Amino acid sequence: MNPPNRTGHRFFVFSGKLAGLLYSLCCYLFFLLTALYLIGFLAGIGVPKDINSGPGITWPLAVLVDAILITLFAAQHSGMARKNFKRWWMRFIPATLERATYVLSSCLVLALLFVLWQPIATPVWNVESPWGKGLLIALFWLGWGIVLLATFLISHFELFGVKQTLDAWRKRIPEKPAFKSPWLYKLVRHPLYVGFLIAFWATPDMTAGHLLFAILSTSYILIGAHLEEKDLVDSLGEVYQSYQQEVGMLVPKRNQTKGR
């Protein structure tokens, strides 16, 4: 028979792992809802407030508010991803919950953006041709399809913090980061970002507010990709440097090496 203190310890460990797993699943569910809302927010379908809806304020103030919201997301999203922040942050939370908490934080900032975004309804372009309109709508959904596929080509559930808690639950030792470049990653180094760029720009009805979102988001993606690549070079070394030389970041290189 197990001593009471050992039984209590096992129950405590079991409860902690279960709580961590449930927490990561809740964060993942919130991410799914946020991602779906982002799609509706940009497309103007199925959401109570989209990128072009709302009472509106003077355009200079709207530009300022929207720029602050994008900057806030950029600061949170890139700041919490840096190694120095992670080292500090993991003094307060378990390593297995770090990624799920990062995902939750990003979703909360995005939710704030949805609520506070100020529309600028001035039309930039309006495609009335059925063919042109259909093409842009198809590109919009293609972009989101690329985003989803790109996450599964690497490790979807690890990217969003579920695998870490599931490994802890199953008592699996976390795998060391290893370089891999499946399918789309042989064409460009960041297909996930390519998908976002397509989705952000592909619309038959571009307003000034949507254009501002696309421009600021594109700027952040370029900056964020640069910061991410610095971390990847630090962790993977020459392997990733070789990959950088062979494969374009967002656009395929003309004489790109195949079969990596």
UniProtKB/Swiss-Prot annotation:
Is the Transferase keyword given for this protein? yes
Where's it found, cell-wise?
Answer: Membrane
List the GO cellular component terms: membrane
Q: Which InterPro entries match?
A: MddA, Nurim-like
Membrane-crossing residue ranges in chain numbering? 27-47, 55-75, 107-127, 134-154, 196-216
Its membrane topology, per UniProt?
A: Multi-pass membrane protein
Task: Give a GO biological-process term.
Answer: methylation
Q: Does the keyword NAD apply?
A: no
Q: Which UniProt keywords apply?
A: Membrane, Methyltransferase, S-adenosyl-L-methionine, Transferase, Transmembrane, Transmembrane helix
List its EC numbers.
2.1.1.334
Reaction it catalyzes = methanethiol + S-adenosyl-L-methionine = dimethyl sulfide + S-adenosyl-L-homocysteine + H(+)
Superkingdom as given in the UniProt entry: Bacteria
Cite the GO molecular-function annotations of the record: methyltransferase activity
Its family remark reads: Belongs to the nurim family.
The record's PANTHER family line, in alphabetical order, gives: NURIM
Q: What does this protein do?
A: Catalyzes the methylation of methanethiol (MeSH) to yield dimethylsulphide (DMS).
Q: What is this protein called?
A: Methanethiol S-methyltransferase
Upper taxonomic classification of the species?
Bacteria, Pseudomonadati, Pseudomonadota, Gammaproteobacteria, Pseudomonadales
